[in-house]
Amino acid sequence: MMAAKREHADCGAEPARKRVKENYKRVTGKLLSKMTISLENHLYYTFTFRLLNENKTEAYYGNLQCFKDLVEQECYDVSLNFVKTKYNERIEINEYSKCDAAIDENVAVKLCLTRADFENEEIVNVLAKLKCVFKRLGANNYKMVFDINMQDAGGAVFVQQVECFANLKVLASAAKAFVKSPDNFNSLMDFYYKNTNTLFYVHGVRCQHTSKGQNEFLNWTAGPSTSLETPSNTDNEDYINLVHSHSTNNISRANKHLKSMQLSLFKAEQKINDNGKHSFSVQFKTLDSMDDDDDTKWHKCVYYVDSNGNKEDPNDTNAVQKLAMDFDQLATCLADKLTKATIFVTADNADASTMNLLGLLKHDDEECEYQFL
């Protein structure tokens, strides 16, 4: 298959192109993902390749014909144009043909990470244990949580939690090898929910390092090239260490770690302080006793409403009232055994009974139905 050369005027209202360095480079790679981006009345087509026998990915722009022709997980020879306009410059696919060259699937996978990986904001492929995927209450962003092996400056290895920023489209792309219809939300969440504590090779996540005051935070960010793969080498100390370890420290937070637990009972009381800030005092019981505590004990956590704190803002008021109703409905449904639910909390490292509520997931895993509050 060979595509015609790109027409230089196919970008609609874009400014006239000043210079095109045609076929400045040729690459061979496996197409990991393709996606469209709509921005300021322009539709952009983007393609992410894993380059032949190289431990890296690169992303290029293309056109509609590329999007129709190129098939994910196939290998292509691609020639690239460097295009410079008055306002920007970018690398675009010019010509492409399917090739039979075998991509080296044995991409180097790290079994543990170091602080330097985060400080240098490296893009890594790494062994990790999936702990959960959750969505924050009242927000549209998702997070994946993993256990990983972290090596300190002295060479000692400890299992730590790390959180990974992702949107729904990235979550779907990452699970493409395991989910038949990853764009179906229920199918996608069913995969992530049922693979808690499963080990994967996590490909193409970017390490990030931020600081606030005396605290430093290490995170991952997932992107279009991020993918999950079943580990091929399970006979090593690092793999076995992850299988049998349970982290109680989260490097993405200060002196906290994250827990997810299946609920048996739930109740919430709305509160408001003198400054008009809303919060909910939450109590819950879990199906499995937490940390070998008495399973009749009510566990406690707090949820602070992220609002403008403006008593006159009807949007704030309505959002709080809707959340109170959702909590009340969840309490009734659990008590009447009409639904199942999982709670996501942060727990203090020094006192695991001190918890803040992050998110709630209602689910019927037999019917493959999932809904985040």
Swiss-Prot record:
Location (main, coarse)? host cell
Stated name of the protein: Late expression factor 3
What's a Gene Ontology MF term here? DNA binding
Q: What are the protein's UniProt keywords? A: DNA-binding, Early protein, Host nucleus, Transcription, Transcription regulation
GO BP of this protein = regulation of DNA-templated transcription; viral genome replication
Function according to Swiss-Prot or TrEMBL = Required for late and very late gene expression. Lef-3 could be a single-stranded DNA-binding protein.
Its GO CC terms?
host cell nucleus
- Keyword Transferase listed: no
One Pfam family in the UniProt entry: Baculo_LEF-3
What is the organism field in this record?
Orgyia pseudotsugata multicapsid polyhedrosis virus (OpMNPV)
| Gene encoding the protein | LEF-3
Provide the assembly information: Interacts with alkaline nuclease.
Q: Which family does it belong to?
A: Belongs to the baculoviridae LEF-3 family.
Family annotation (InterPro entries)? Baculo_LEF-3
Record's keyword annotation contains Transcription regulation: yes
